[in-house]
């Protein structure tokens, strides 16, 4: 622990110093027709310890209220960090004891503009310590990384938010528009006791907000250039598939395990689940996916024919990120849980399966028709969770501000839109008409399999990337 930072970290610090010098000369900047105060110095080094501290709060979300500790302890700590520098903080619990959320607003220079929501979730998925190189809730700082559950999903962004919010308030920095910092519960279970509850029960918290940024966007993907060398693409999330969790139920004739018959619920269910799990739904490239592949093709010279049945194979050229991209080319139905029986020698009357379905925008009816054909008449289905898809366009002043912020710190950057195969709290906020993007900037090592870290063993985030992201985000929030 506490090892010296590798060379890339020193480069980030040099970039930070040069930025500080520029900002120190100009304490004010004109954004549009409004003069706003800009930062003289962003304390980017602070983010490492803040993220480490956040990870040490065990905010595991099992998906069951009975076994989920909740986010309250962590949320109270976040609230204290903001109150300490003068924010009027609202702490509230969302639908169940211990499900803590924190909101704080920073007034901007132009009150006539819509506010910007910067949101992050405090909960994390479970982790088994025996499987990890370090304890998942240690927040260890080793080998140039901060380790632990939540390091990339998403206490990295939460840490950046805290550092920047404190710095802006302490330094008297006035952004161009109102900023609303939201730290919420239960994202890892669809937001039932978090963002969804807040939107349904406390819409006043989002009054005046027109746009939002959150997780799983703004990270770099290094690709080979067609003329030699490499290019860093920064993926801005502009779309998400819908999230539908489905329960399948087969009913059969119960009986003694020694006597075989043709109405075994377990057999019926297993056959249906196997058909569904092996099925590949049709390719339906969306606007965000087409724009992403077009941009990658321009840089690399790779050909991506979105009308080709072998588009999956072409996407494999992208390396580890191909897992996410391939999952956005079509609908998916992934069996994740099975339940049947209570004794070895008893044939059960029912058998159940749970399937995680992620569906492209506008595809729900067609998806349901395909599923019904696959599972057959002897298996019933029901949705246990249904959260919508969304897609926005890759344009406008906010996108321009993201691009400018990245270029200010990484002149070789290029921003590109992409679709997330998973889901975020943006699904809830979009219901209020808020235009949502994924923008949690990280400059990553080219050989880091970033997507494998989400919900993975030995989840970790580079120290350099945290400092880079804090600098980019601070620039963005003074020009948004």
List each language-model region with its residue ranges.
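Low-acidity, Ser/Thr- and Arg-rich intrinsically disordered low-complexity segments
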Residues: 8-14, 18-23, 29
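Metal-dependent amide/peptide-bond hydrolase catalytic core
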Residues: 31-42, 218-239, 243-474, 478
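Acidic/His- and Gly-rich active-site-bordering loop/insert found
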Residues: 35-149, 170-177, 355
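Sec-exported extracytoplasmic/periplasmic mature domains
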Residues: 56-59, 83, 87, 166, ...
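Loop/turn elements at helix/coil->beta-strand transitions in domains of secreted/extracellular proteins
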Residues: 87, 114, 177, 208-210, ...
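Short beta-strand segments
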Residues: 119-120, 183, 213-215, 249-251
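Short pre-catalytic strand/loop immediately N-terminal to key active-site residues, enriched for Gly-Thr
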Residues: 142-153, 413-416, 457-458
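Acidic/histidine-rich catalytic neighborhood of metal-dependent amide-processing enzymes
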Residues: 145-146, 152-235
């Amino acid at each position: 622990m506490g090892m010296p930072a590798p060379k890339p970290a020193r480069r980030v610090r040099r970039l930070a110093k040069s930025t500080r010098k520029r900002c120190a000369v100009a304490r004010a900047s004109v954004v549009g027709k409004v003069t706003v105060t800009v930062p003289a110095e962003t304390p980017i080094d602070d983010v490492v310890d803040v993220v480490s501290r956040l990870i040490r709060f065990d905010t595991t979300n099992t998906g069951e209220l009975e076994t989920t500790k909740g986010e309250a302890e962590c949320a109270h700590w976040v609230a204290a960090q903001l109150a300490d520098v003068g924010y009027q903080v609202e702490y509230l619990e969302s639908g169940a004891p211990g499900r803590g959320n924190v909101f704080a607003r920073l007034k901007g220079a132009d009150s006539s503009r819509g506010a910007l929501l910067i949101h992050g979730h405090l909960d994390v998925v479970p982790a088994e310590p025996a499987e990890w190189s370090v304890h998942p809730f240690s927040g260890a700082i080793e080998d140039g990384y901060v380790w632990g559950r939540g390091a990339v999903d998403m206490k990295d962004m939460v840490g950046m938010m805290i550092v920047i919010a404190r710095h802006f308030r302490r330094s008297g920095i006035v952004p161009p528009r109102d900023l609303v910092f939201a730290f919420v519960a239960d994202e890892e279970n669809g937001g039932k006791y978090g963002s969804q509850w807040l939107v349904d029960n406390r819409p006043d918290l989002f009054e005046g907000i027109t746009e939002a940024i959150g997780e799983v966007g703004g990270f770099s993907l290094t690709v080979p250039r067609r003329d030699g060398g490499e290019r860093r693409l920064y993926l801005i999330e502009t779309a998400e598939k819908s999230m539908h969790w489905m329960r399948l139920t087969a009913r059969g004739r119960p009986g003694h395990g020694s006597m075989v018959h043709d109405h075994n619920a377990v057999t019926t269910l297993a056959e249906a689940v196997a058909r569904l799990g092996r099925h590949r739904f049709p390719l339906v490239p969306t606007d965000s996916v087409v724009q992403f592949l077009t941009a990658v093709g321009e840089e690399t010279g790779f050909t991506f024919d979105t009308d080709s049945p072998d588009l999956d194979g072409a996407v494999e050229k992208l390396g580890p990120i191909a897992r996410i991209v391939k999952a956005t080319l079509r609908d998916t139905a992934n069996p994740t849980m099975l339940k049947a029986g209570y004794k070895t020698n008893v044939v059960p009357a029912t058998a159940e399966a749970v399937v995680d379905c992620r569906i492209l925008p506008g595809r729900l009816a067609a998806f349901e028709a395909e599923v019904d054909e696959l599972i057959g008449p002897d298996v019933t289905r029901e949705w246990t969770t249904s959260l919508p898809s969304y897609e926005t366009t890759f344009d406008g002043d906010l996108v321009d501000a993201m691009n400018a912020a990245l270029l200010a710190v990484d002149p070789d950057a290029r921003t590109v839109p992409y679709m997330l195969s998973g889901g975020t709290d943006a699904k809830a906020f979009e219901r209020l008409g808020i235009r949502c993007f994924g923008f949690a900037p990280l400059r990553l090592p080219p050989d880091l399999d970033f997507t494998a870290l989400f919900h993975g063993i030995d989840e970790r985030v580079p120290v350099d990337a945290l400092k880079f992201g804090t600098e980019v985000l601070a620039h963005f929030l003074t020009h948004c």
